[in-house]
């Protein structure tokens, strides 16, 4: 990549924000969303393998700092959180685990078996997604009963621009070699879309 291309690429991207403290779920969502975009957007990664490895290493360090700040935030705020906030915390944790998997040293041409070391993370993502869908179903069930409608978890999905559980479930299905975990992720993905 030429200097001009590198300058053009870097001038269009905001740096991943420094994170030492999280003060709200909105901040946690916004900062993790930015990290997601660095990992997820096709074609934005450096073409040089050394640059890719260096960027993934920087993101792994950032994700460790985010997790520590998020854990500190939960310790100080969780007792006063309502059900919707707790659901959002689960969504954020599922996305954090997913970012950690994507930022790993496993290369872009990896097979699902190359991700076997993340099986506990895949399992945790599925369990978090189940809890999110269960909470959303409980939230909409009283409304459905009173109106006679048939609502699905997608009816109470987060606002556009917020992280949700679809992308983490997709990564489980794309990267997990455990058929049982894959099957649960697939069913939850369909359920979360109301299918």
Which residues does each predicted region cover?
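Cytosolic regulatory protein-protein interaction regions
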Residues: 2-176
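Structural helix-adjacent loops and short alpha-helical linkers that scaffold large soluble proteins
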Residues: 177-182
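TPR/TPR-like (Sel1-like) alpha-helical repeat modules
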Residues: 189-194
């Amino acid at each position: 990549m030429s200097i001009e291309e590198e300058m053009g690429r870097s001038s269009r991207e905001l740096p991943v924000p420094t994170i030492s403290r999280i003060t709200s779920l909105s901040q946690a969502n916004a900062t993790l969303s930015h990290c997601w975009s660095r990992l997820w957007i096709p074609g934005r990664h450096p073409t040089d393998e050394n640059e890719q490895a260096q960027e993934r290493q920087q993101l792994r360090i950032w994700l460790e700092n985010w997790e520590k700040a998020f854990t500190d935030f939960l310790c100080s705020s969780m007792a006063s959180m309502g059900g919707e906030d707790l659901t959002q915390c689960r969504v954020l944790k599922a996305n954090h685990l997913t970012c950690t998997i994507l930022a790993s040293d496993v290369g872009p041409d990896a097979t699902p078996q190359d991700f076997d070391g993340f099986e506990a993370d895949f399992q945790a993502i599925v369990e978090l997604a189940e809890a999110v869908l269960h909470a959303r179903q409980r939230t909409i069930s009283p409304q459905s009963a009173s109106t006679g409608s048939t609502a699905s978890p997608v009816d109470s999905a987060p606002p556009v621009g917020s992280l949700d559980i679809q992308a983490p479930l997709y990564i489980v299905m794309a990267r997990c070699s455990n058929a049982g975990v894959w099957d649960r992720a697939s069913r939850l993905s369909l359920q979360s879309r109301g299918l």
